[in-house]
Amino acid sequence: MARSIWKGPFVDGYLLKKADASRATGRSEVIKIWSRRSTILPQFVGLTFGVYNGHKHVPVNVTEEMIGHKFGEFSPTRTFHGHSADKKARRG
């Protein structure tokens, strides 16, 4: 079930402060965040966030198309190594 419109998008408070501070300094450095549940807002466009995936911070450059999505969608937590080959098919 989607979030109610009257509640508005969820964003951790510290995330807004970090984004505003980064815009004020004008430096393009990676902002490390652990809040995968936060929604990407229009004021984050152009910034680079390091979204934690449980192992490392994955750099995510925010673009217009990402607005409304969650940060966690762009930082996968699992690595797929492929399925094992069918042993019957290999025998010939």
From Swiss-Prot:
Regions crossing the membrane: none
Keyword field: Ribonucleoprotein, Ribosomal protein, RNA-binding, rRNA-binding
Keyword rRNA-binding: yes
Gene Ontology cellular component terms for the protein in this record: cytoplasm; small ribosomal subunit
BP-aspect Gene Ontology terms: ribosomal small subunit assembly; translation
Coiled coil: none
Pfam families in the record: Ribosomal_S19
Gene Ontology molecular function: any one: structural constituent of ribosome
Protein family per UniProt: Belongs to the universal ribosomal protein uS19 family.
NCBIfam families from the UniProt entry: rpsS_bact
Function description: Protein S19 forms a complex with S13 that binds strongly to the 16S ribosomal RNA.
Protein name per Swiss-Prot or TrEMBL: Small ribosomal subunit protein uS19
Organism: Methylocella silvestris (strain DSM 15510 / CIP 108128 / LMG 27833 / NCIMB 13906 / BL2)
Taxon lineage: Bacteria, Pseudomonadati, Pseudomonadota, Alphaproteobacteria, Hyphomicrobiales
